[in-house]
Swiss-Prot record:
PTM notes: Trimethylation of Lys-119 observed in other calmodulins is absent here.
PROSITE patterns recorded: EF_HAND_1, EF_HAND_2
EF-hand domain mapped to chain residues: 11-46, 47-82, 84-119, 120-155
Disulfide bond positions: none
Positions of Ca(2+) 2 binding: D60, D62, N64, T66, E71
SUPFAM superfamilies attached to this UniProt entry: EF-hand (SSF47473)
Protein name: Calmodulin
Species the sequence originates in: Chlamydomonas reinhardtii
Molecular function GO terms recorded: calcium ion binding
C-alpha cells in the first residue's frame, strides 16, 4: 500500500503537508473526516460525500474517524492516479459534446458512435441516453457520463426488465 506514495514528488508531498497542516486545527497530527472534504477541494479535487466515506474507510485503519499524515499521503497518491483517469474521461466527454454546451444529446451520441463504426439504431441510442440520464432531462451531463463510463451502465439492460 505504501508503494503508492513513492510516486509522489517532493514538491507534491510538501504541498500535501501544507494542506494537511492547514486543516489540522489543533496541531495534533490528525484531521477529522469532516475536514477531509475541505482539504481535497483545496487541492482541486471534488469528491462526493460517498467518495469521502469510501476514502476514509480505506485509510482510517483504526476506525477512529481521524486521518494522520501518512494515511493522508496514501489517499492523495491514490486520488492522483484517479485524476489521470478523470482527465481522460473529460477529454472523451468533449469528443461527444460536439457543441460544447456541457451536455451530450442523443444526436451527438449517435454521431460519435456512428463515426466509431458502431451502427446503433435510434432505439439503442435512446436507450443509452435513458440509462445514463439520471436527472431525466433527455441529455447526458458530465457526471452522468462519468457514471456511465465507470459503472458500465449500458451493460445493465437485462437487469432492468428489458426483454
Amino acid at each position: 500500500m505504501a508503494a503508492n506514495t513513492e510516486q509522489l514528488t517532493e514538491e507534491q508531498i510538501a504541498e500535501f503537508k501544507e494542506a494537511f497542516a492547514l486543516f489540522d486545527k489543533d496541531g495534533d497530527g490528525t484531521i477529522t473526516t469532516k475536514e477531509l472534504g475541505t482539504v481535497m477541494r483545496s487541492l482541486g479535487q471534488n469528491p462526493t460525500e460517498a467518495e469521502l466515506q469510501d476514502m476514509i474507510s480505506e485509510v482510517d485503519a483504526d476506525g477512529n474517524g481521524t486521518i494522520d499524515f501518512p494515511e493522508f499521503l496514501m489517499l492523495m497518491a491514490r486520488k492522483m492516479k484517479e485524476t489521470d483517469h478523470e482527465d481522460e474521461l473529460r477529454e472523451a466527454f468533449k469528443v461527444f459534446d460536439k457543441d460544447g454546451n456541457g451536455f451530450i444529446s442523443a444526436a451527438e451520441l449517435r454521431h460519435v458512435m456512428t463515426n466509431l463504426g458502431e451502427k446503433l439504431s435510434e432505439e439503442e441510442v435512446d436507450e443509452m441516453i435513458r440509462e445514463a440520464d439520471v436527472d431525466g432531462d433527455g441529455q447526458v451531463n458530465y457526471e452522468e457520463f462519468v457514471r456511465m463510463m465507470t459503472s458500465g451502465a449500458t451493460d445493465d439492460k437485462d437487469k432492468k426488465g428489458h426483454k
